[in-house]
Amino acid sequence: MKITDVRIRLKDEEKLKGIASITIDECFVVHDIKVIEGRDGLFVSMPNKKNAEGAHKDIAHPIKTETRMELQATVLNAYKKALEEAKAE
């Protein structure tokens, strides 16, 4: 699996800092990946839906730890680049 494109929409909310869409292998897109500011810094939250009990359940997510780490690093790098570009404007 290769992430071939990342698009970031910057947000300036208390915890929500951005929303990403990624393209995998130039043929599959995942939207609404959130960039969140947590207690220990930035992290990526996969698209999710609230169930009947009020808990959030991921709609799509990596199964392997290595894949999750790669996805998070790629999205956070794109977020930081988008933030730098926005500050330069």
Where does each model-flagged region fall?
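Single-stranded nucleic acid-binding surfaces, predominantly the OB-fold ssDNA-binding core
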Residues: M1-E89
